[in-house]
Amino acid sequence: MKFGKVKKLHFVGIGGIGMCGIAEVLHNQGYVITGSDLSMTEVTDHLTEIGIKVVQGHVAENIDEADCVVISSAVHADNPEVNEAKRRKIPVIRRAEMLGELMRLKFGIGVAGTHGKTTTTSILGHLLVEAGMDPTVMVGGRVISLGTTVKLGKGDLLVAEADEYDRSFLNLTPSMAVLTTIEEDHLDYYKDLAEIMAAFTQFANKVPFYGAIHLNLDDSNVVSLIPDLIRPVRTFGIKSQADTRADNIIADGTATDFDLYYHDYRLGHIHLPLPGVFNVKNALAAISVALEFDIPFETIKKALESFKGVNRRFDLIGEQNGIKVYDDYAHHPTEIDVTLRAAKVAFKSRVIVVFQPHLFSRTRDFYQEFAKSLLMCDMLILAKLYPAREEPIAGVTSQMISDAAALFGHKNVRYIEDINQIPSAIAEYAQPGDVVFTIGAGDIYRTAPKILEALKK
């Protein structure tokens, strides 16, 4: 892979889940990579261990002799490193543009959707690895079977998440597209659902004439795109008209069984070690692509049944005194709803939730929907809102969700602003047999081990 005379690249916000994977791929291909981030985490520690220089904080001197500066969506325009790069006429590009360059040199498979991107990409990557195709895989989460967020393969395929935020996915050049779900989100950027759907249509139609668009027939918004799609369409889902279909679905604890059909022909039975029908649909998306490549059913079955999941997706952190603690990345009302439904099916016990809202704008736009989705839990604790890339919005706090949940009938809901007090609050309430979930896209995952410690006492 050659980028002309560009040899040194600096990543601003290198600890971001989408940034670190690209940095690692380029590092593995011989580029000199440096990066900076506001905080040091397991991700930045990993990058340091493999030889990438990472510094904490953003100052102009960090870019050193970089030939190009790569920034994430979370980086503000007044960032001193960005300003220094512009002053010195060093190219500044967004993460998605760099991912587009990587994808341009491979047969790219872009997985897009409001929900399910990470799990679908992870399953597909694992499946292609098991099929011996040695793909490059770039995921927005740590794939347990890969042990990382990225795998650099020698094959022709590159599988990556395609993020719709700020139309980032329009920078990509996919040879094949996967559309999981479409729903209102990122309303700080998009005007409405119609604008979101138009962006997804534009993304899908970037597929060349020799590619295909694999879409979820169970999602009405995705289906609504079909009349405007100009490339071959393949469908997956549980509806009887889907090309790749699951039937006889049985949820059993944290796993799901189903029969797989392709064009109404039964291929066989699959035991998926993931909970919920939503994960069956994620698996079907990956299977649809696998069948496009003529991967045999037995290989598909073996790959799915050996899939170990994704970090922060229904992720068991540990158990203490008969109380299990899970962590999940859900940060949209629909994601919370399907996670808690799966939890109720899996455990048949009391479910305690610690939810940390992510983004002021999302909380403002969906606080009532969040409250409704959280009514299924037996105890609800709201943590302080995680702002991520946003500045505060007057009057918008986690208290809005707490108040709405109480208004809608939740009998055991609290807002605890000090996150350090949450573990003891859980320990006082929890009983053997209960299940605790920390939920959110911010740093709430760090509270899960602390809850386990509190449960020891």
Predicted regions and their residues:
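Phosphate-binding loop of NTP-binding sites
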Residues: V25-Y31, T48, E61-N62, S73-L217, ...
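Beta-strand->loop->alpha-helix junctions that form or flank phosphate-binding loops
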Residues: S36, V55-H58, I93-E97, M138-V139, ...
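Short internal beta-strands
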Residues: Y31-L38, A212-L217, V353-Q356, C377-P387
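Short acidic/histidine-rich motifs immediately flanking catalytic phosphotransfer sites
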Residues: I63-C68, D156, Q431-D434
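C-terminal helical cap/extension that packs against the catalytic core
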Residues: A371-P432
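Nucleotide phosphate-binding/pyrophosphate-handling subdomain across enzymes
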Residues: K2-H10, G18, V25-Q29, G253-T254, ...
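Conserved hydrophobic helix-helix packing surfaces used for dimerization/oligomerization
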Residues: K8-F11, V69, I109, P135, ...
